[in-house]
Design a protein with these regions (language model features):
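Conserved "HGTGT" condensation-loop signature of ketosynthase/thiolase-family condensing enzymes
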Residues: 1-77, 113-163
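Generic internal hydrophobic packing segments that stabilize the cores of diverse globular domains
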Residues: 64, 79, 90-93
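Short, conserved beta-strand segments within well-ordered enzyme catalytic domains
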Residues: 50-52, 81, 108
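Active-site-proximal alpha-helical scaffold in enzymes
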Residues: 84-114, 157-163
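Short loop-beta-helix segment that forms the pyridoxal 5′-phosphate
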Residues: 76-85
Length: 163
């Protein structure tokens, strides 16, 4: 089994819903960060074999491929999108590690992206005239305190003094 290493990590700033980043689509948010992490880690973009991105609030299509095309990655790099609530970005990273360990790829860029400002709008019923923003469904019993993953991450970071 081939060894796998994480050689870089970056994230965007956090912005409130309808805040300063609300005009940017997810590929516009993610592409500069991907370009930056590749450059900072000393990897050449043409060395990247795969891009894996988690996006749970997407409107469909293949956000990962759109991100690959918007970044400096070569056109041959595909885009695999994971649709999973909570820890989808970590799943993308773990899948990238497994691809490297299995020898199916040498360099994988992986992570997650969301834009609550740009989440899809849907009809509650097929012929309903009321538009409803897509919100994450309940995943825990009412007895558990359900918070979004980002909020949980900030609480853990604060508790352990991480910045």
């Amino acid at each position: 089994m081939q060894s796998a290493y994480i050689v870089g990590a970056k994230r965007s700033i956090v912005s409130p819903i309808n805040g300063p980043l609300s005009s940017l689509q997810i590929h516009e948010l993610a592409a500069p960060i991907i370009n930056n992490v590749i450059e900072a880690s000393g990897i050449k973009s043409d060395e990247v074999d795969e891009l894996i991105v988690s996006n749970a609030l997407g409107a469909g299509g293949n956000p990962s491929r759109l991100i690959a095309l918007a970044s400096n990655l070569p056109e041959r790099v595909g885009g695999l999108t994971i649709d999973r609530q909570c820890v989808g970005g970590l799943d993308a990273i773990m899948l990238g590690i497994k691809l490297v360990q299995a020898g199916a790829a040498n360099v994988v860029v992986a992570g997650g992206v969301e834009s609550f400002s740009n989440r899809p709008i849907r009809l509650a019923q097929e012929y309903d005239k009321i538009l409803v923003p897509y919100d994450t469904p309940e995943f825990t019993p009412d007895s558990d305190q359900e918070i979004h993953m980002a909020e949980a991450a900030f609480k853990v970071a604060e508790k352990f003094g991480l910045t």
